Amino acid sequence: MIDFRKKNIFELNVQKTFLFLLTIFIIKVISILNSPLSLSVDEAQYWDWSNNLDLGYFSKPPFIAWLIASTTYFFGITEWSIRLSAPIFHLLIAVMIWFISKSIYNIKVANFITLIWATLPLTSFGSLIISTDTPLLLFWCMSLFTLLKTLESNKIIWPILLGISIGLEL
């Protein structure tokens, strides 16, 4: 029998946090697979762009088209495959938030902030649709993390990665 006075089973640790993130990711992928929603106008436009890849489009950067082209190449042209990169990127955003929070604060705070991010209603909705904001937010988080590493380290790799992540935000 577990003595709850001695051990807090609800205390977060890194393994529980990442297991929770993985569980949320699986639920989001299942939700996309079973979603009755058709593509929004923007999603359909991005899918159209993915059929004619270019270095840029009139109103948006090209990364969203490249993402959709990669997922539809591997999984076929379906609504769920067009949206598949959204939960993947949101999982990566959560991981980056964990690393940023750990870098600024500590592991306990990082676990808590990451779980808050992963369970926000807007985050949950945003991970079910594909938009230009999803990769932008990931690369913004990567830029913040690499900036923190650049400021605390003399290694040349961090400024290079900072430049790459800022460039990918565009």
Predicted region positions:
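Transmembrane alpha-helices of multi-pass, membrane-embedded glycan-processing enzymes
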Residues: 68-72, 85-96, 136-139
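Short acidic/glycine- and proline-prone juxtamembrane loop motifs at membrane-interface regions
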Residues: 122-136
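Extracytoplasmic catalytic/substrate-binding loops of multi-pass membrane glycan-assembly enzymes
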Residues: 34-46, 55-67, 76-80
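Membrane-interface transmembrane helices that cradle and orient dolichyl/undecaprenyl
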Residues: 102-107, 143-158
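Short helix- or helix-capping micro-motifs
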Residues: 24, 113-121, 166, 170
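Transmembrane signal-anchor helices characteristic of membrane glycosylation enzymes that use polyprenol
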Residues: 13-39
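Membrane-interface alpha helices of multi-pass inner-membrane proteins
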Residues: 52, 158-170
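Loop-to-helix entry region of an early transmembrane alpha helix in multi-pass inner-membrane enzymes
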Residues: 62-66, 76-92, 126-130
